[in-house]
Regions:
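Nucleotidyltransferase catalytic core that binds NTPs
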Residues: 1-146
Length: 146
């Protein structure tokens, strides 16, 4: 496919599961466009502050070979920003996880006739939530890597 693939998420504590998801997106399209939750959006969505700022997370994502562009949004979902950008971006597909089958973003993409591909969760990699729990459980001064 000549067109880019759109993904979205928080990407806080970027880990192997995130990287696998980005790589998968790159395999089905020409470049990856990321809609990234802002710090305020994460606070609304998860009732906690992100570990890294949206600017830091965007810089990490932009450094990924497959990522073409990163757009930061303040709402709980990127639909308002996508509404403004989807025509100019002309994505060929939206990739999301099977956890978001009925999401407002999926419905929006379908309304724009953009195919939606569902990826299974990379369960062999820890989630950001489990990584944060592991870090919080460490005795003070202990290295999280072991």
């Amino acid at each position: 496919m000549d067109k880019p693939v759109v993904i979205n998420g928080c990407f806080d504590l970027l880990h192997e599961g995130h990287l696998g998801f980005i790589r998968l997106a790159s395999l089905v399209g020409n470049g990856v466009i990321v809609f990234l939750n802002s710090d305020a959006s994460i606070r609304k969505l998860k009732n906690r502050s992100p570990v890294f700022s949206d600017q830091h997370r965007a810089a990490l994502l932009r450094s990924n070979y497959y990522v073409r562009e990163v757009y930061i949004f303040d709402e709980e979902t990127p639909v308002h920003l996508m509404t403004r950008l989807v025509e100019s971006l002309n994505p060929g597909m939206y990739l999301t996880s099977t956890e978001h089958i009925d999401s407002i973003v999926v419905k929006f993409m379908q309304s724009k006739f953009i195919p939606v591909l569902y990826a299974p969760r990379f369960s062999n990699f820890p989630s950001t939530t489990s990584l944060l729990a592991k870090i919080r459980a460490l005795p003070e001064g202990q290295n999280p890597a072991g």
